[in-house]
Swiss-Prot record:
<keyword id="KW-0808">Transferase</keyword>
<dbReference type="InterPro" id="IPR027417">
    <property type="entry name" value="P-loop_NTPase"/>
</dbReference>
<dbReference type="GO" id="GO:0005524">
    <property type="term" value="F:ATP binding"/>
</dbReference>
<protein>
    <recommendedName>
        <fullName>Guanylate kinase</fullName>
        <ecNumber>2.7.4.8</ecNumber>
    </recommendedName>
</protein>
<keyword id="KW-0547">Nucleotide-binding</keyword>
<feature type="binding site">
    <location>
        <begin position="12"/>
        <end position="19"/>
    </location>
    <ligand>
        <name>ATP</name>
    </ligand>
</feature>
<dbReference type="InterPro" id="IPR008145">
    <property type="entry name" value="GK/Ca_channel_bsu"/>
</dbReference>
<keyword id="KW-0418">Kinase</keyword>
<dbReference type="GO" id="GO:0004385">
    <property type="term" value="F:guanylate kinase activity"/>
</dbReference>
<dbReference type="Pfam" id="PF00625">
    <property type="entry name" value="Guanylate_kin"/>
</dbReference>
<dbReference type="InterPro" id="IPR017665">
    <property type="entry name" value="Guanylate_kinase"/>
</dbReference>
<dbReference type="GO" id="GO:0005829">
    <property type="term" value="C:cytosol"/>
</dbReference>
<keyword id="KW-0067">ATP-binding</keyword>
<dbReference type="InterPro" id="IPR008144">
    <property type="entry name" value="Guanylate_kin-like_dom"/>
</dbReference>
<comment type="function">
    <text>Essential for recycling GMP and indirectly, cGMP.</text>
</comment>
<dbReference type="InterPro" id="IPR020590">
    <property type="entry name" value="Guanylate_kinase_CS"/>
</dbReference>
<feature type="domain" description="Guanylate kinase-like">
    <location>
        <begin position="5"/>
        <end position="182"/>
    </location>
</feature>
Length: 209
């Protein structure tokens, strides 16, 4: 199996259950959850390096010029981004990194880190998606319609991903994602260097020791 960790990028429409699945994965296995950087002010109880990396606008722009983000965007006047260095260090150390991110951000990450594992979370049906969003109790009728329209559009991006998981139950979704991770770590293009180095080492021992 591959000695390097994996970058597991999880996204999907609002209400598909991405956050719940990521929390369940974090409980089951040793994952490192990617922490975003932002230029917005810290909110109460937010912790530097755990909630976000809080940067000034100048610091953020400096990192952009240094190609320091896997992706970044400006939202309502504040910058948000996924720091490249911290993610790559964890992966090189053999840790699996989970990145829960919106679809546009995921596609940017794919451009910069195509060897990542990109998983799209789908609801069992659009009717179920509607129930989940309504069940939150935090949406107006107008915002509900906006979310539904957005979800229909976002589902069209599923073909850009490596895998699609239907979130009928969290347990089933987590089991499937864990299976994907095991399979990805056994892919020849991820482990061929380890195999070749191991073979050459054994041949060298047989002939020269």
């Amino acid at each position: 199996m591959s000695k390097k960790g994996l970058l597991i990028v999880i996204s999907g429409p609002s209400g598909a259950g991405k956050g719940t699945i990521c929390k369940a994965l974090m409980k089951e296995q040793q994952f490192w959850l990617s922490v975003s950087a932002t230029t917005r002010e810290p909110r109460e109880k937010e912790v530097e390096g755990k909630s976000y990396y809080f940067l000034t606008v100048d610091e953020f722009k400096s990192k952009i010029s240094e190609d320091g983000f896997l992706e970044y965007a400006e939202v309502y006047g504040n910058y948000y981004g996924t720091p490249k260095k911290s993610v790559c260090e964890k992966i090189d150390n053999g840790e699996n990194v989970i990145l829960e991110i919106d679809i546009q951000g995921a596609l940017k990450v794919k451009e910069n880190y195509p060897e990542g594992v990109f998983i799209f979370i789908l609801p069992p049906s659009m009717e179920e998606l509607k129930k989940r969003i309504i069940g939150r109790g935090s949406e107006t009728e107008k915002s509900l319609m906006t979310r539904f329209k957005s979800a229909y559009k976002e589902i069209n991006y599923v073909s850009k991903y490596n895998y699609a998981i239907i979130n009928d139950t969290v347990e089933n979704a987590v089991t499937k994602i864990n299976s994907i991770i095991v399979a990805e770590k056994c892919r020849v293009d991820r482990i061929k260097d380890n195999i070749i180095d191991s073979k050459e080492g054994k041949i060298h021992e047989q002939f020269y020791d």
